[in-house]
């Protein structure tokens, strides 16, 4: 039996090899969700990894990508209180941040000098609805709410620096997203998990209303209705079951089948942090996380799949064996303000690790190449106001030109 000319299928175990469902998956035929779930739960991890790498190689060949970025921590006050988070700060905390636009633009300008292309703008969830300090900060800046500030700041960043904004401000409404459509190449919003159980008393999202799956799903759908490319993802190891991981991935895939706008899914491993309600919880085991990653590739197929390298500093290269094709945003000049205890590896080190696994590391923009080089998709998903900023940066593959990164023009 042959599968689309693929030669390494014979390395599957006998039981896996004889299962017709794997050939349906590879050939993108309709697969019964119950059969798929049974396969993902019961198959040996080495078989799932091999299937995941076959699927990844069909779509991405030997190219692994990353986004060269700066992290603009605009405001870290947040109305939610997730049980695992240290990003959120109270207004009285000396580490509380409320930048003014000139400070944010200065960071973006430093990024441009460092040949970055993405300006990641991160905020807490609707801080002005909980904190008078945040409301006063916005008023002093001449805005009624955070969305107005994000729209204004994004326009200034792209026009003054040429950097492409990618905003992650939580569960935005359709109206709020539309305010960012002409200035942001894409958006970011983690689904985290689609299980309502995780919002119950004592669970990770009990005190985080915006993490209610209904709220997050509404935002994912709104982005789809706007043809707005978005990156989402799951947080693995917050007391979810593997079945809940599968259901979450199936939900993401169903939304993308309808709209085609989910450009990337992040599989993020939970790390307990001191001072949080979950500081004594355990991180997901390595085999479990590998199974989750492989399941993501098998379910999502041609959606880009990322694992943050800074959260698995000693083993992140192994995730290439489970089907990932992207390392996400890596900054040469700013820290990961969400996980400051986990510094990014250098881009040079990521390149070495990637090449040792037989892949080529290339920089991408915060909007994925398929939305740029395909004329039909480009007209739909890339806003016309951004095209003049995008075109000088990319090669024929929709990736960042090497000569730009090397400061040759």
Please give the residue ranges for each predicted region.
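Active-site phosphate/pyrophosphate- and oxyanion-stabilizing loops and adjacent acidic/basic residues
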Residues: 53, 72, 155, 294
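Conserved Radical SAM active-site core
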Residues: 91-257
